Structure formats: structure tokens, C-alpha cells
């Protein structure tokens, strides 16, 4: 390795300036000298350490943080150019590569967009070229994306920092402030998944939108950034992801799930009609309080929907509208829900539980395995 570095000073200089293609060239020289016995990932890591290389990848996906205001006053997704310009201004001494993984407003987020982001992150980690990754995204679906990346990449050896902005980059300093802290966090941390917003470093789990400019973590006694569970452990061993396959798996998962919220006047019959003629397998229900619901024999009872779902082999996963720990053991109304096989998702918020479902869908080989994984996580994230 040292011979390859010594004999190729120009390639090393380019590498130290943040252009990563010489890393493959130098790694190839080492592999040739060792007749293929060296491990490419280890070689890349050693070269980076030897040359003191610290490259941050910024993966952009759109949102207000890179959006533009049109002449008619409307807002549309921009491109990564503005983020590259801002990053060069706020972190001129940090080698940074900006990569686009789609440009859309966060309310337009679809499973295929997640697939592109997941594959891009995985590729940067697997290549051994990233010392940190910053992901920019819109605020409306930030709670879902942050949790998804936590479930998948919390065991990664590269820190991943997600950030966003509620205002446009040319109309406020919010994007600049958040990007600066995101880059600093990605440069400082060794691993884990983080969210940077409003001058704070937050956990990606149970991320809750309070109001423009403010996110917080609900229902956590301590912030969680690492070791989310078995899915992340399994995912960290995958080095080559096919984007089409990931997109198909996520699309299939979205087709087989449904989400509803209890409210005064909730009528099971409306949902039963949908469930009888659909391929839905997993249903998320936002319950009242710690898991209460109407389980009487009235027209406004949840019970008929649970019974219909059970007959069709569907699974019910419950979260709390009040964002508190679900506990079916106290209220008599919760006992009835539990009796029908509904699974309380502990202290996970709806967004984190739904993101967990998508993460498990990428690793499960069958509905039965998916059900088992979800129940194991429910137990793991219950107080």
C-alpha cells in the first residue's frame, strides 16, 4: 500500500482534495501486488487513514432546503446546485461530494424514491469512500425517512446525518445553519444515524414535527442513534443492493399495508368493505391514549374490523395518537383489543412503526417472517 502511495503522488493529491476515483486505482494496485489476497474494503480504509482522508457525501433528495420560488410565487423542487454552493461557503476545508438521489417535494415521496436513497447510501458505505454521509430531505415526511434510515443503517460504520429546512435557501439562513451542523456532526461522529434540525442533534426515532422550525423526539427517555435491532445488523452485511429489487419490495409492502386512526364516529363497516376486496396484510391503527378503543357491539366499534381482519389472516399493529407508550394491560377497553390479536408497538410513534414495517419488508422472506419480526420489535421497544 505504501509503495502504491509513494509512486503515485498526483493520484494521492487528487484523492486528498475530495475526488474519490483515484482510490479505486490505488486499491487496484494493491490488489495486483497481493495477487488478489487483500480485502478491498480494508485496503481502502488503510489508504484513507494513511492519507488522512475525510470525505463527506451529501445526498440530496429535494424538499424546501433546495427548492426555488417561481415568478408566480409558487414553490417547486430545485436541484442540488444551491446546496453545493452553500456547502462550499460554510465548510470550505471539508472534502465534500454532492450527489442527487432525486429532486421532489417531500409530500411527493414514493417507495421508489426511498429505494434510490437506500441504494445510494449503501453504495457509498460499501465502497469504503465515505467518512460521513449527509442526507437532505423535506420536512413533511422527514419523520418517516429518518426512522427508516435508523432501522436500516444504525449499525453502519459510517455516520449518517439527515437534515432539512422549513424555508427556502434563498429566503432564509435556516438551510445554511442546519447544513453547517449536519456536516460538523457527520465529520465528528464515528457511526450512527442522526437528525440535525433547528440547531439541535436529534434522534431519528420518534421524530415529531412541532411547528415550522421545530422538531422534537417524543416518548424517549434517552436519544437513540445506534443499534436499532436485528434488521440493521442484517442490513450492514449487504454490500450490493439492486435498486429495482429494493423498489419492488417497498412498492409491494406499500400495497399490502393500510393505516387508520380512531375517532368519535369511527365505523368498522366502512373499512371492512375495503379489507374484504384488497390484498392488505398489515394494518396500523392509531389508538386512543395507552391503547383504548371502542370494543362494544355498537355501530362505532373497532371490534368488527378486528374480527374481519383475523379471519383473513391480517395483522394489526397499534400506536398511540397521544404519542405515549402503548400498554394494553390497564383499561378494560384495551383488553378487548389485545384479545383479538392486535400488537401494541410500545413507545414507537406511528411514523417510526410504519418505517419499521418497510425496513422489515426488505429483509423478510414471507408474511409470516415479517409478522414475527414486527412482534419482536414491538417487545424490544416496549417499556
Say what each PLM segment does.
Residues 1-53:
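Charged, compositionally biased, marginally structured helical/coil segments
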Amino acid at each position: 500500500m505504501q509503495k502504491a502511495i509513494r509512486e503515485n503522488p498526483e493520484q494521492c493529491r487528487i484523492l486528498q482534495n475530495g475526488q474519490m476515483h483515484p482510490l479505486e486505482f490505488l486499491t487496484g494496485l494493491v490488489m495486483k501486488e497481493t495477487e488478489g489476497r487483500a480485502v478491498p474494503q480494508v485496503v481502502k480504509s488503510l489508504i484513507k487513514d494513511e492519507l488522512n482522508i475525510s470525505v463527506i457525501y451529501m445526498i440530496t433528495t429535494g424538499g424546501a432546503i433546495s427548492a426555488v420560488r417561481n415568478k408566480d410565487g409558487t414553490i417547486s423542487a430545485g436541484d442540488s446546485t444551491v446546496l453545493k454552493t452553500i456547502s462550499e461557503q460554510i465548510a470550505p476545508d471539508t472534502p465534500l461530494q454532492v450527489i442527487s438521489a432525486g429532486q421532489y417535494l417531500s409530500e411527493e415521496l414514493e417507495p421508489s424514491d426511498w429505494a434510490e436513497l437506500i441504494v445510494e447510501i449503501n453504495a457509498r458505505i460499501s465502497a469504503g469512500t465515505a467518512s460521513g454521509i449527509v442526507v437532505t430531505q423535506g420536512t413533511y415526511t422527514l419523520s418517516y425517512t429518518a426512522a427508516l434510515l435508523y432501522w436500516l443503517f444504525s449499525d453502519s460504520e459510517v455516520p449518517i446525518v439527515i437534515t432539512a429546512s422549513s424555508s427556502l435557501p434563498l429566503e432564509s439562513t435556516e438551510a445554511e445553519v442546519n447544513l453547517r451542523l449536519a456536516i460538523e456532526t457527520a465529520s465528528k461522529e464515528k457511526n450512527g444515524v442522526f437528525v440535525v434540525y433547528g440547531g439541535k442533534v436529534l434522534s431519528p426515532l420518534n421524530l415529531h414535527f412541532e411547528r415550522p422550525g421545530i422538531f422534537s423526539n417524543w416518548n424517549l427517555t434517552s436519544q437513540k442513534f445506534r443499534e436499532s435491532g436485528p434488521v440493521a445488523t442484517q442490513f450492514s452485511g449487504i454490500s450490493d443492493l439492486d435498486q429495482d429489487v429494493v423498489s419492488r419490495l417497498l412498492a409491494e409492502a406499500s400495497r399490502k399495508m393500510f393505516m387508520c386512526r380512531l375517532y368519535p364516529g369511527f365505523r368498522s363497516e366502512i373499512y371492512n368493505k375495503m379489507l374484504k376486496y384488497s390484498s392488505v396484510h398489515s394494518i396500523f391503527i392509531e389508538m386512543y391514549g395507552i391503547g383504548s378503543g371502542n370494543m362494544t357491539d355498537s355501530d362505532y366499534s373497532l371490534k368488527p374490523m378486528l374480527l374481519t381482519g383475523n379471519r383473513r389472516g391480517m395483522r394489526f399493529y397499534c400506536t398511540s395518537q397521544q404519542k405515549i407508550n402503548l400498554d394494553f394491560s390497564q383499561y378494560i377497553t384495551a383488553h378487548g383489543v389485545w384479545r383479538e390479536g392486535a400488537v401494541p408497538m410500545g413507545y414507537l410513534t406511528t411514523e417510526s412503526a410504519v418505517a419499521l414495517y418497510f425496513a422489515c419488508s426488505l429483509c423478510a422472506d414471507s408474511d409470516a417472517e415479517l409478522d414475527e419480526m414486527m412482534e419482536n420489535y414491538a417487545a424490544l421497544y416496549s417499556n
